[in-house]
């Protein structure tokens, strides 16, 4: 059914199509083989029939970009063993694929600090409940500016997230077979590759400005990885017959009323 056909029968049409496409980072190398949108991977392991039914899990070191619950969920699936997921309703084809998962290191990157992370306390703590995963945070990444301190005062959830991250940073190294590193103040600037495939992700070290924002320091690091998952948000897709601003990723509107042109 087209929008024009619906207009013949309805006085108003509400478009609640959501944002389903993975946002891109806008950096060189995103088209190399081994780059994935988190939403695509979530669709795979949730068994969504609109997504791939098989997945390349040959990467031993993986980068996950983003510091929200989606990035945690993707990291958890990559770091856990397939057998640990049998208590869930994991589809058979996903279990079979994850049995072949070779990931031993998962590196999560956020360009700002702990107080700006969008994790929920429960999700962050659950990450550490698996006996096969060691969550690692560099003590040097536990840093706060004035705005960060105020954010902790203003929201208990933010303070709990910071406390959990601090506890990860303070403990002694463990012997779990899978390592999950959470890196703050690292802004991805390029995905590197050879022969068309991901070989590393390059980040720039950032520092807090005092208001919760960050500035690049000009110090760069290349992290050897064979796959990159971006969990940096979702982008709405256009609807046939409705104007769409690709730059702003919105339907041109006036107070919510879609403009004809």
Regions found by a protein language model. Give the residues of each.
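FAD-site-proximal beta/loop scaffold in flavoenzymes
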Residues: 33-52, 191-197, 209-261
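Feature captures the FAD/FMN-dependent oxidoreductase FAD-binding
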Residues: 1-32, 183, 189-202
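Glycine-rich dinucleotide-binding loop and its adjacent helix/turn
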Residues: 22-100, 246-260
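Glycine-/small-residue-rich beta->alpha transition segments that form the dinucleotide
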Residues: 12, 16-23, 30, 39, ...
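Core beta-strand elements of the Rossmann-like FAD/NAD(P) dinucleotide-binding domain
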Residues: 5-12, 57-59, 215-226
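Dinucleotide-binding/catalytic capping subdomain of oxidoreductase cores
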Residues: 72, 76-221, 252-257
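Structured loop/turn residues at beta-strand edges in well-structured enzyme cores
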Residues: 8, 30, 57, 101-104, ...
């Amino acid at each position: 059914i087209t929008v024009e056909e619906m207009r013949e029968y309805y006085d108003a049409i509400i478009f609640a199509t959501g944002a389903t496409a993975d946002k891109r980072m806008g950096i060189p190398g995103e088209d190399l083989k081994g780059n994935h949108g988190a939403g695509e991977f979530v669709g795979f392991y949730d068994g969504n029939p609109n997504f791939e039914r098989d997945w390349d899990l040959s990467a031993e070191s993986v980068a996950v970009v983003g510091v929200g619950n989606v990035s945690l969920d993707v990291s958890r699936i990559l770091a856990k063993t397939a057998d640990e997921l049998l208590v869930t309703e994991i589809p058979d084809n996903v279990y079979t694929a994850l049995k072949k998962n070779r990931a031993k290191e998962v590196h999560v990157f956020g360009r700002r600090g702990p107080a700006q992370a969008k994790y929920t306390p429960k999700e962050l703590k659950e990450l550490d409940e698996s006996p096969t995963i060691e969550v690692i945070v560099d003590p040097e990444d536990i840093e706060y500016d004035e705005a960060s301190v105020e954010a902790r005062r203003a929201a208990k959830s933010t303070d709990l997230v910071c406390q959990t991250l601090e506890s990860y940073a303070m403990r002694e190294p463990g012997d779990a077979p899978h390592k999950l590193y959470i890196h703050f103040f690292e802004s991805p600037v390029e995905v590197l590759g050879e022969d068309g495939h991901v070989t590393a992700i390059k980040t720039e070290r950032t520092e807090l400005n005092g208001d919760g924002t960050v500035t690049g320091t000009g110090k760069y690091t290349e992290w050897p990885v064979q796959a990159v998952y971006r969990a940096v948000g979702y982008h709405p897709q256009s609807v046939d017959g409705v104007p769409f601003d690709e730059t702003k990723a919105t339907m041109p509107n006036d107070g919510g009323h879609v403009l004809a042109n």
